[in-house]
Amino acid sequence: MGFRGAWNKRNRLIEDLDTFLKLYKKAQKAYKKVRKVEFSNNDELIENAKKRYQEIWDEFRAFVNKKAWVDPKLWATIRKMNQTGDRKVVKTYSRDSQVISDFVNHTIAVHNGKTFVPIYITPEMVGHKLGEFAPTRTFRSHPEKSAKVVKKK
């Protein structure tokens, strides 16, 4: 029952970041409560905590499923940078976050499993996932045929 980001099918933008963050924090608190209560012997407490968490989680999923998924911390950072006019490189592990219009003209360093790959966001990238621009595998040319390799008929 861990927290996972929802995948969006409609590619819409979340306009209300404050509501999103409130629901996100509410879901996290409810999940922590479930984890805390699981060690008690009171089955009624456990069931109530799980039921409450499920209600909050369903509300969060209903809100997120209609919108594009963006990591809340990444979005909050970019939002602050837009307000102050900063243009620093932002590091993120969130490859599944979608590029939204707020990210345009920013450089986001996306982790590819080994290093952070800096990506300058352009308007053409809006709607794509950040992970699409940070390849996880390096392509080295195909091996050349050597004289030792002989085809058998």
UniProtKB/Swiss-Prot annotation:
Chain segments carrying region Unknown: 1-63
Transmembrane segments: none
One GO MF term: structural constituent of ribosome
PROSITE patterns, alphabetized: RIBOSOMAL_S19 (PS00323)
Region of interest (Small ribosomal subunit protein uS19), ranges: 64-153
Coiled-coil spans in chain: none
Organism domain of life: Bacteria
GO cellular component: cytoplasm; small ribosomal subunit
Record flagged with keyword rRNA-binding: yes
Gene3D superfamilies: 30s Ribosomal Protein S19, Chain A
Pfam family for this entry, one: Ribosomal_S19
Example GO BP: translation
Keywords: Ribonucleoprotein, Ribosomal protein, RNA-binding, rRNA-binding
Purpose: Protein S19 forms a complex with S13 that binds strongly to the 16S ribosomal RNA.
Record-stated family: Belongs to the universal ribosomal protein uS19 family.
PANTHER family assigned to the protein according to its UniProt record, in alphabetical order: RIBOSOMAL PROTEIN S19P FAMILY MEMBER, SMALL RIBOSOMAL SUBUNIT PROTEIN US19M
Protein name: Small ribosomal subunit protein uS19
Provenance organism: Hydrogenobaculum sp. (strain Y04AAS1)
